Swiss-Prot record:
It is an enzyme of class 4 (lyase). Its cofactor is Mn(2+). Binds 1 Mn(2+) ion per subunit. This is Phosphoenolpyruvate carboxykinase (ATP). It comes from Nitrobacter winogradskyi (strain ATCC 25391 / DSM 10237 / CIP 104748 / NCIMB 11846 / Nb-255). Transmembrane segments: none annotated. GO terms for cellular component: cytosol. The lineage of its organism: Bacteria, Pseudomonadati, Pseudomonadota, Alphaproteobacteria, Hyphomicrobiales. It catalyses: oxaloacetate + ATP = phosphoenolpyruvate + ADP + CO2. Its EC number is 4.1.1.49. It is found in: Cytoplasm. Mn(2+) binds at residues 201, 220, 257. InterPro entries: PEP_carboxykinase_ATP, PEP_carboxykinase_C, PEP_carboxykinase_N, PEPCK_ATP_CS. Signal peptide: none annotated. Belongs to the phosphoenolpyruvate carboxykinase (ATP) family.
């Protein structure tokens, strides 16, 4: 079979059982992949030069269709309460059927790195059925120099075949769609879905499994670094402002989504960004807007004018989860090394729709571990389907529960130790509501959030007075230059103090109920960091 492109000839497609293929294109760049995608009709080019594709019925990840092989090695190491298992025999049958399905196909192969730090990166080979998927993953991971490809030996292999259909009875899965990960054999199989994000997040899941054994904490976070080399980490679930707040013109962006924290500092796992682009505008997010409107960007499910091919980022008729993938170098102030020193600040973002968390609070290491394991934000009507008028809490362990192969306590203990070792200042920032909950209060002004965050990152908050929040126990500043004092204490912003008390106590109960599953895995200091502990002692 023809194999075209620069590669390690000793580790070709046949090494992975991929035989009788029509052709394999090795490490093609964007121009070649555009040509293949257009020739096959799998994508189109818009008026800005971006490559645009639709993903059909799957416009997001399908976590219920993700499975991990349970064998002698993973039986004790994987967190089975949060991961679905399949047997080695079921995976073997699935792998065999993948290889059979690939016969007579043209595949695209990319040799890439998962991780910017040469000491901890994982050499990753990705075979894709679709050219636009190949461009996507080439954009999202880190690309080796051409001179490195001839000796590239993969440590992780991904086979991505959207046209494959799984057999639930034969393969032990839920539907025809499947993501199967074998940590022992270091293979990922993805079938049935055209949604390219499945590749990105399944590779992230494997990094979350392998890196703790090398004393590296994998994190679902964004990160940036100041002019003085002071790096900062931003945790937060969707809608909390993680991407927006880490994109600070006065600081260099390290990455927007996945990072590792090692003895040497922090590093990006990726070489690109995967931004939500629903209602994207030049005014609100100029850098992401510009990056999404040029050759080399990949747009998923973005609606275009049929004649002019001009994108309409405001149109969510296909999905609210429209996406733009682009190389990190498309962002003017991005770090191309993807590495920085030890962080000085760690920020946990929560869009508290109950309106009872302060706009900023300082956390002890034990409180930081508690809130890291909790991973709190809140959903409201208008941003999620099937929600009523009341906010709904969302707790996702380590701010990334779907991607945790190990018990959350593994990552929590690593975080706590790193915070203590490097004397990191930890902050909880509420980007949600103030003056009342969703429906009666107002969204926290972004100007206030930026001012408080700036004061935290530049060290200004170290010189201001703090008081202990009666409800949640963390330290809250009583005055910050440039910020109205009353907004710092949430109860002062509510007209109805009795309703504030009721709402705060209700949220405390939600935190405590969620944390019951971790109580036996943490020490007394972390348990006592729970919201409401001070009130109980009164």
């Amino acid at each position: 079979m023809p194999e075209i492109g620069v590669r390690n000839g000793a580790f070709g497609a046949d090494k992975f059982g991929l035989q009788n293929l029509k052709a394999v294109y090795w490490n093609p760049g964007a121009p070649q992949l555009y040509e293949h995608a257009l020739r096959s009709g799998e994508a189109m080019v818009n008026a800005d030069g971006a490559l645009c594709a639709e993903t059909g019925i799957f416009t997001g990840r399908s976590p219920k269709d993700k499975f991990t092989v349970r064998d002698a090695a993973t039986d004790k190491s994987v967190w089975w309460a949060g991961n679905q298992s399949m047997t080695p025999d079921q995976f073997a049958a699935l792998y065999s059927d993948f290889l059979a399905h690939a016969r007579n196909m043209t595949l695209f192969a990319q040799d890439l790195y998962g991780g910017a730090d040469p000491n901890f990166r994982i050499k990753t080979r990705v075979f894709t059925e679709l050219a636009w998927h190949s461009l996507f993953i080439r954009t999202l991971l880190r690309r080796p120099e051409t001179s490195e490809l001839a000796a590239f030996v993969p440590e992780l292999t991904v086979i991505d075949l959207p046209s494959f259909r799984a057999d639930p009875q034969r393969h032990g899965v839920r539907s025809e769609n499947v993501v199967a990960i074998d940590f022992t054999r270091r293979i990922i199989l993805i079938g049935g879905s055209h949604y390219a994000g499945e590749m990105k997040k399944s590779i992230f899941t494997t990094l979350n499994y392998y890196l703790p054994d090398q004393d590296v904490l994998p994190m679902h976070c964004s990160a940036n670094v100041g002019p003085g080399g002071d790096s900062a980490i931003f945790f937060g679930l969707s809608g909390t402002g993680k991407t927006t707040l880490s994109a600070d013109p006065g600081r260099t962006l390290i990455g927007d989504d996945e990072h590792g924290w090692s003895k040497d500092g922090i590093f990006n796992f990726e070489g690109g960004c995967y931004a939500k682009c629903i209602r994207l505008s030049r005014e609100a997010e100029p850098e992401i807007y510009a990056a999404s409107k040029r050759f080399g960007a990949v747009l998923e499910n973005v609606v275009h004018d049929e004649v002019t091919r001009v994108p309409d980022f405001n149109d969510g008729s296909k999905t609210e989860n429209t996406r733009s993938a682009y190389p990190l170098e498309f962002i003017p102030n991005a770090s191309l090394t993807g590495c920085a020193g030890q962080p000085k600040n760690l920020v946990m973002l929560a869009a508290d729709a109950f309106g009872v968390l302060p706009p900023i609070a300082r956390l002890t290491p034990a409180q930081a571990m508690y809130h890291f394991l909790s991973g709190y934000t809140a959903k409201v009507a208008g941003t999620e389907r099937d929600l009523g008028n009341e906010p709904q809490p969302e707790f996702s362990a380590c701010f990334g529960s779907p991607f945790l192969p190990r018990h959350p306590g593994v990552y929590g203990n690593m975080l706590r130790a790193l915070i203590a070792k490097h004397n990191v200042d930890c902050w909880l920032v509420n980007t949600g509501w103030t003056g009342g909950k969703y429906g009666t209060g107002r969204r926290m002004p972004i100007k206030v959030t930026r001012a408080l965050l700036g004061a935290a990152l530049d060290g200004s908050l170290r010189g201001v007075p703090f008081h202990d929040d009666r409800y949640f126990g963390f330290a809250v500043p009583t005055s910050v230059p440039g910020v109205e004092p009353h907004i710092l204490d949430p109860i002062r912003t509510w007209a109805d103090k009795i309703e504030f008390d009721r709402t705060a106590r209700a949220l405390i109960g939600m935190f405590r109920q969620n944390f019951t599953k971790f109580e036996n895995d943490v020490d007394a200091e972390v348990r006592e960091a729970a919201p409401g502990t001070m009130m109980a002692a009164e």
